[in-house]
Amino acid sequence: MAKEKFERSKPHVNVGTIGHVDHGKTTLTAALTTILAKKFGGAAKAYDQIDNAPEEKARGITINTSHVEYETETRHYAHVDCPGHADYVKNMITGAAQMDGAILVCSAADGPMPQTREHILLARQVGVPYIIVFMNKCDMVDDAELLELVEMEIRDLLSSYDFPGDDCPIVQGSALKALEGDAAYEEKIFELAAALDSYIPTPERAVDKPFLLPIEDVFSISGRGTVVTGRVERGIIHVGDEIEIVGLKETQKTTCTGVEMFRKLLDEGQAGDNVGVLLRGTKREDVERGQVLAKPGTITPHTKFKAEVYVLSKEEGGRHTPFFANYRPQFYFRTTDVTGAVTLEEGVEMVMPGENVTITVELIAPIAMEEGLRFAIREGGRTVGAGVVSSVIA
């Protein structure tokens, strides 16, 4: 059979499985690919194909992640599944796989467990906007009342972390039985897919968001002015647009008088393009790497924020010793390092390599910042951790 052409017509959504070890995340991932492939096309993946997750690097951190894809009637999904708990923590904090929504897998036989709670908290901290629940292994529970109790417990847990526990779709099923071809449980997989389709809104595409370009380099071109280069992170820049230069110094206003790519002049540059932007009346020394160009009023510079961070273990090339309050590493945002002082949460004396923890950071220079911004923690150019801004303080 000839290979099918990849259809770009359906909107694309990123999801992933989260939940406690051995509650059936990988089995559910296999069931989704296998059962949806029968109806909507796509490739079925077996459990061991998914479980054998390849290593990848994100922000200098090695993570094992499996990527699969499947389709529903209206959408194309990319789905991530991780083999170990530490991989989930790293994946969610580094944003290696940005999720538009997560499928929380919880065993009906065991109910919510410590990692169920931890993954919900992480999802909240790193800004996963929607959670859908799959209660797995329901074939092992004969008592309908028990299923109801577990469902209530999951809803309460979601609500306690500011997710709308009462409204989150919860599908009761058995991934293993579905894989074995039990029609009633196969139906539950379709029910889960329908919940994904209806509950997670179609994500806004990067080009539709407000313009942002992290500055990588600055040149002065005689007779033309100052050019900054970088990759457009989101939105579109048109010739003639007013823009702001944000971060490290006072915010400056300027106008884009030219956009070029591969030495050709363009009318606009959009998300994903590596461009040079010509700035009217801006001096070479007023702009530097580490600032961003942005649509006016869409992003502001900040020095103080709360973050969720993962600290690399010694084996991963991280620190060999713990760090304490007032630790002062460099925080690498987008294209530059800024030194910052760390404050630990009340009752936390120190942070060991290999842990994930909430910290407050005060930078010595302001960075264009918003919730969800990812960063690396470095010491002398070596990555020792990764983090995500969970809230901006000042």
UniProtKB/Swiss-Prot annotation:
Monomer. GTP hydrolase that promotes the GTP-dependent binding of aminoacyl-tRNA to the A-site of ribosomes during protein biosynthesis. This is Elongation factor Tu. It comes from the Bacteria. It comes from Neisseria meningitidis serogroup B (strain ATCC BAA-335 / MC58). Residues 174-176 are annotated as: G5. Residues 60-64 are annotated as: G2. Its EC number is 3.6.5.3. Present in outer membrane vesicle formulations which are used as vaccines in human. It catalyses: GTP + H2O = GDP + phosphate + H(+).
